[in-house]
Amino acid sequence: MQLTLNKSDRHSSNRAGGGAKMMTLIGALVGFIAGILIYLIQEYWIADFDDAYFEIAALFFVATFAFSALMLARHNQIIKPVIGALVIAGALFVLDYNLISFGSARDNDINTFPLFFWVMLSRSLVLFLALTLMRASLDGSFPPRYVDVFENGVSIPIITAGAKLIALLTLLLLFAWARLLKEFDVLFFHELFQEQWFLFPFLGAIAGLSISLMHGQTAVISAIRFLLKLLSRITIFVSALFTITLAMVLITKGTSALFEADVERPAVILIGLAMTGMLIFNGVYQDGQDKPPPLWLRIPTLITLIGFPVYSSLAFMALFARIDDYGLTPIRITGLVIAGMAALYSIVCLAGLLSELRWRAQRWMVPVGPLNTVMAGIWILALAGLASPLINLWSISAQSQFARIASEKVDAEDFDYGYVRFELGKYGEEQLRKMKELDSHPQIDIIRDEVDEVLSAPSYWEYKFPLTDDSEFEAADEPVSDL
C-alpha cells in the first residue's frame, strides 16, 4: 500500500513538473509572438505616429493581451484564460483609442491630463483589478470569493515585479556578453541586438519566460507576502498616530487650518493619505479568514478605520472649494471621482467598525471581505468611465466654465478665456462663442472683446502677452547690452 502511494505521489509530481515546463515554454512562445506583432505594427503599419491612433491602441492591445493571457494561464485550462485575456485587452483597447485620439500630443489646444493619468496610473490599476477578479474567478467560483481575490491581488504585483527583475537581469547579462564579444572584434551579436526585428521578439520572449518562471516560485511569493504583512502591521501604528494628530488639529484649530496652510493641492495629499490607510488596513486584514488580532494590533487598526472617512470628507471639502471658485476642469473632475471612491470606501470601514460590536467573534470583520470585492468592481467601472467616450471631461469642463460667466459668478475681466480656448479644445471654442450671445450680461462688451481676442490668438502665451507691432519683435531680437 505504501509503495502504491509513493508511486502515485511521484506520478503527480512528474505531471506537475511537466505542466510547469510546458507553461514556461508557452510563456516564452506567447512573448515571442507578441514581440513579432509589435515589431510589425510599428514598422509597417504606423506611417505617421501623430495620427496613428488606432495603430498605437493596437500596440497596447497586443501587449495587454499577451500579459493578461500569461497572468491568467493555468496548466489545466486554455480556453478560459484566453477568453478572459481577450475581454480585458479588448475593453482597454476601446478606452486607449478614445483617449489617444482625444489627447494627442500634436493637439496643442486640449488638456492632456486625462491621457497622462490614464497611461501613467489609471490603466495599470484597471488592468490589475480586472486580472485579480478574473484570476480569482478561474481559481474558484463566480462571483469570486474574497479569499481568492486577496490571494491573487497580492500575487499579481509580486509576479510582475519578479518577472521584471528576472527580465532586466537577463538582458543586462546578454548585453554585457555582447559588449564583451565586441571587444574581441566579434561584432555579430552586438549588431544583432541593435536590430529591431530581432530585439522586439527577443524582449517579448524574455518577458514571457520571466512571467512563467515567476508563476512557479510559490515559496518566494509566500515569503514576500509575509514581509508585506509584517510591514503593514508596523505601519498601521504610524497611520493611527497620524489620524490622532489630525484629529487634534481639527479639534483645536478647525478645518480652516488645513486649507489655509501653505500647501499646494491639499485634496491630493488627503486622498493620498486615505488610499495609503486603505492599503495598510487591508494588509493587516489579509484574506478575512483569521481570528481577531491581539489588542495591540486591533486598536490602531480601528483608529485608522475611523480616520478614513475624515480624510475623504476633507478631500471633498478642498475640491469643492476649488470648484466653487474656479469651476470644473479635467483634473478636478478626476479628483472628484477618486475622492468619491474614497468616500464610498467609508462604507466598508463603517461595516468593519460595526462588526466590532461582536468583539469576541470567531472571524474578524466578516463584512469587509465581500465589500472589498464589490469595491474592486466599482473601481474598474469608475476609472474606465473616466477614460470612456461616455464621460467627456473636456466638454463637461467647458460647460462649467460657461456657467461661471453666464451666472455672473466671476468678473468678466478676471475670467481665464485662454484656458477655455487652449485647454478644452473644440468644446471650449463652442462655449466661448456661446458667451458672445449672452446679450443680457452686464459685461457683454468685455466678454465679446476677450472672446474675439482669444479666438484669434495662435497660442495661450501670445494671448496672455500680445505683441502689438513688429517693433516689439525687433526689440526682442536685439541683444541686451552688457552695460
Predicted regions and their residues:
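Low-complexity, intrinsically disordered regions enriched in charged/polar residues
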Residues: 124-127, 140-147, 171, 221, ...
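Hydrophobic/aromatic interaction determinants used to assemble and anchor large protein complexes
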Residues: 2-312, 321-387
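Hydrophobic alpha-helical transmembrane segments in integral membrane proteins
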Residues: 381-412
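Extracytosolic and intramembrane catalytic regions of membrane-associated proteins
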Residues: 414-483
